[in-house]
Every structure is written in structure tokens, then in C-alpha cells.
Amino acid sequence: MPRIQVLPPGLVNQIAAGEVVERPASVVKELVENALDAGATSVSIDVEEGGLALVRVADDGCGMSADDAQLALERHATSKLRDAEGLAAIATMGFRGEALPAIASVARFRLDTAPAEDGAGTRVEVEGGGRPSSGPVARPRGTTIEVRDLFFNTPARRKFMRAAATESGHVTEAVVRLALARPDVGFTLRSAGRLVLGSRAGAAAADRAAQALGRDAHRHLVPVDAGRGNVRVRGLVCSPDHSEATGRALYLFVNGRYVRDRGAAHAVLRAFAGTLPPGRHPAGVLFVELPLDRVDVNVHPQKLEVRFAEAREVYDALFHAIAGTLRTAPWLAHGRAGGSAPPGPVALTPPGGAGSDETAAVLAWAREAHAPEGSGALVPPPSPVPGASGTFAFAIPDEAGLARPAGYFASLRYVGQHARTYLLCEAQGGTLVVIDQHASHERLLFQRLREVFRTRKLPVQPFLLPQVVTLPPAVARALEGGLPELARLGFDVEPFGGDSFAVKGAPAALAGVDLEALLLDLSAQLELVGSGTAVDEALHDLLATMACHAAVRANQEVAPEEARALLDGLDAIDFKARCPHGRPVVFELPLAELERRVGRR
């Protein structure tokens, strides 16, 4: 068996490069982060052949002295960290001192830098991790780093690189993330001399978000700003009218650092539940701010993942920030009549008459539910929020006309029913309003059911005989921790030994529901986020299903008085844009558009 020996420094750096330098985009990320840590206000990036032939990053930061320039290529040499206490509260983008030596070990590397404007600078060159050579160079204050022929000395790594166009796309995405985090810094990205991205320092947050999300997103952006405990959430999200097929359009930053975090992304997705069609994902740019000692950034080679001291706290802050925006944003809350008592329940009969006991219970609860009283005026859009240290101002496009006036649905003139599925109405000015009768009634019932769950401790309907439910061990522990919340929701559940629980009662509205499957789902949510506040949201799918079964169906006759009651009911709830499954409730066709289509204009 070979004897253990210490590896030579060059090989050590190449091994480190395997973790830090995944592709050209990794080089761009590390070099730009160094520029930002150096106080740069302008960063220029040039790449050729997707960054494999050349990556050049130039900045106007503080620059380095001759001694520091040479020391920067030593492993674990850094100006950003001094002791273990500093590691627990990292405020800079970089801190390990690994990136430059790792990059220099797998490329032809050149660093030009100057700490002052006197033109006296230093050049350091390294080829494939060899011995550095240095000398003077004339240049202005700042630093320029060139990385040529990436992976030229590690052909096994080079052959796994994608086509130049693919690598260029990864580089662009890396720069977009960095530009989103620092609107106070100007960024320029060129590929083979062609301008790919240009963003001036001090650009509006919405403009940079639109660069990342697409120009069409600009008119859908609404600011988010909310605090909960030690966590503050700021940023911009798009309305459900601008959603994506994947989750890649959701940019999450923690203390200014772009991260990938499943729990945080799930919190945002859960807040959007019921507003997006199946398979669609929210888009936005969100910044989570919390004390530095509450987050560990030293858990991933590329610092793309973090570990929170209290993940539940972050999850709840994100969820409530987004959910609060969804309740008040003008593109979702169409207003309600202020100061008046909500109208009575809609007297629509589900298919087959009164329906099951479950449906009857749903309708009974809906009759008891009350929407919150109006404030007497349309809920205003969130105010623009000054960015932290003046670096991120949430300027958004004019939203005039996006919010419907209070009492909008009650003001409609009911015309009739089309295809026994759609309610046709006329709005002021001759606009044709088409309302999906099932989606709208489903939303109305769902909102009232959810209001009952949120505002009251529901009475327990005792069972004649307890039902024993056995769950997987980890799930059972999560359920055990959530028993107080389950009691508030009307469940009488007690431990029954091992991983079993005795269910002695449940809310009357859950008659006929598979309790084991329901408790398994609730436990899974508790296990995921460790938060009792998520239990109500975990019931979303169940409540949506119950409302769906109780609502009037498509291809069902609706009497004029029933249609009128439904319209009045929609004005009594604070959300009516989409059904709980994400389908639109209402569609408008302005008179001018109708006349244009028939040739009158």
C-alpha cells in the first residue's frame, strides 16, 4: 500500500479549483465578488468563447500594493478575515483566500493593480500554477485580472465544458445575479466584443429586475417590504399573470449574497399557492436581511448555500411577507365595499342537490364566515421603500388603472349566462366582463372557509370510537410537536404509543376525509418548516378541494338572482382574481377592443 504523503502546492490548488472553479461563470463570479469587496463602483467583464479563451474583469476599487498583489496568490491569504470570531459574522462576499490561487492553477493568469492614481502599479503573472513573476506596470487605481485558456493544463476538466454559447449563458446569469445584488455599482458585460449587458450605477431596482426577468415583467412588479422577528424581507415580485415554467426566475439573496435555498424557495411558492396554475412558478427578486451571526455562509465551496441559525424564522418571514403583498397588491385585490356588512352566502346548489355531508358542512361554515370589514377606501399599493444604505430603491411602473374600484362586481349589470359556464356582465363604459361561474364560486367559498380556520378555534366533533393512525418515525415526531396547532384547528389527537396517535375528534366539515392521509400531509409540512404557523397553509389543498366540490359546476344553470348574489359575494372578499387552483376568475373585453375586432374602429 502506498505511503501517505503531503501533496505538492500546485496539485493542492488544482484540487481546490475543482471545488471553486466549476466553469468560466465561476471565475467571473469570484473575480467580480473580489472587485465588490474592494469597493468598486464600476465593473467591466469581457469574455471570449464563453470564458474558456478569456475572462477579463476590470474594476475601479481600492487596488493592491506590490506586496499584497503577490500575497493574494497564496492559498488562504486574505484581507477579509482575521480570526474565528470574524468567521461567525462574514460581511464580505469572499473570505477564504482560495479563489485566486485556484484559478491561477488551471489557467494563464495575469493581475494588474494599483492602489493610487499616481500610475504606479504592479503586474503579477502565473501560468498553470507555476512560479509567479511580477513587475511594475503603469495603470490607474483599481485592478484588472485576465484569465486565459481556462483548464488548458487539465484536459479532463476541459472536455466536460459545454459549447461556447452555453458557457456564455452561464456567465451572463452570474453577472445578472451580482448586478441585482448591487444596484449601486455599474456593470458591463461583453462577449467577443459585443455588449451583452450594461447597467449603470444607481439604476432603479425595477429596471435591473426587468433585465433579469424580461422586459414584460416590468409592468407586473410590485414591491415587498416586511419584517418578522430578526428577519426583514425586501424586493420585488411579479403578479401571477407573469409566471415561469421553472423556479429559475426567483432570485433569492441573503445579506446581499445570491443563494439557493429550498426552504426559502418553498416559502415563496407556498405564499403563491392558489394564485398560480399547476406547474407554474413565481418570479421575483427578494432580499432577506438578518444579523450576520444568524447565518453561516461557510458551508458550500462556491458559497451558493447557507445555513440559518433558525430556518423557521426565515421561512415564516418570507411566507408572511409575500402573502401580505398578495393580499394588498392592486393587481390582486380588486377592492371591496367599505364599511358595509358583507352580503349573505351565495345560494348556489352544487350538482346533485344538497350533496354529501362534507359539502353540507362546508356550506354551513361558509354561511357563518365573515370577510374582514372594509376600511372605507381601496387598499393602497405598498409604498416605495428606500433601499438599505440608499442602494436599492423600489421604484415601480405606474399602476393606475390596475386596481378595480370598491364594489366593482356589485356595479356590474348582469346580462346572462353563456354555455352554462360563464356569467356575462357589462361594466361602465360598455366593457364586457366574463366570469367563470365555477372558479368564482370556488374562490368565494374557499376564502370564507379559510377565514374561519384562521380566526377561530374550531369546535371538535367527537368520534364514537377513536381512530388510530400510525406514521413514519420522523413524521410522527413532527406531528407530536404540532399538536397544539392541530387542537386550534379542531383536532383532538393524542399520542398512542410509539409512532401511533389516537384521533378522538375532528372538525365537522372534515366528515368523510381520509384522516391518516390528512395528518400525514400536515406532519410533512411541520417536518419541512418546523413551524406551527404553516399548518393553516398546509390545509390549502384540502380547503380548495372542499370548496371545489361545493361550488357550482360548469355546464350548470345559474338563475339571475344566484348570479347576482355571487357578484355581490365577490366584493366581500379581499381576493378574487383566481380560483384556489390558480385559474383566472374574470376576463374583460373593453368596448374599444370589441369594436376594433368587428371593424367599427
UniProtKB/Swiss-Prot annotation:
Q: Pfam families under this entry?
A: DNA_mis_repair, HATPase_c_3, MutL_C
Q: Which InterPro entries match?
A: DNA_mismatch_repair_CS, DNA_mismatch_repair_MutL, DNA_mismatch_S5_2-like, HATPase_C_sf, MutL/Mlh/PMS, MutL/Mlh/Pms-like, MutL_C, MutL_C_dimsub
* Source organism, top-level taxon: Bacteria
Q: From its record, what is one biological process in GO terms? A: mismatch repair
Keywords noted in UniProt: DNA damage, DNA repair
> Which SUPFAM superfamilies does this chain map to?
ATPase domain of HSP90 chaperone/DNA topoisomerase II/histidine kinase, DNA mismatch repair protein MutL, Ribosomal protein S5 domain 2-like
Q: What is a GO molecular function of this protein?
A: ATP binding
This entry carries the following GO cellular component terms, namely:
mismatch repair complex
Region of interest called Disordered, as start-end residue ranges on this chain: 119-140
Entry's family note? Belongs to the DNA mismatch repair MutL/HexB family.
Record HAMAP family:
DNA_mis_repair
- Briefly state the protein's biological role: This protein is involved in the repair of mismatches in DNA. It is required for dam-dependent methyl-directed DNA mismatch repair. May act as a 'molecular matchmaker', a protein that promotes the formation of a stable complex between two or more DNA-binding proteins in an ATP-dependent manner without itself being part of a final effector complex.
Q: What is this protein called?
A: DNA mismatch repair protein MutL
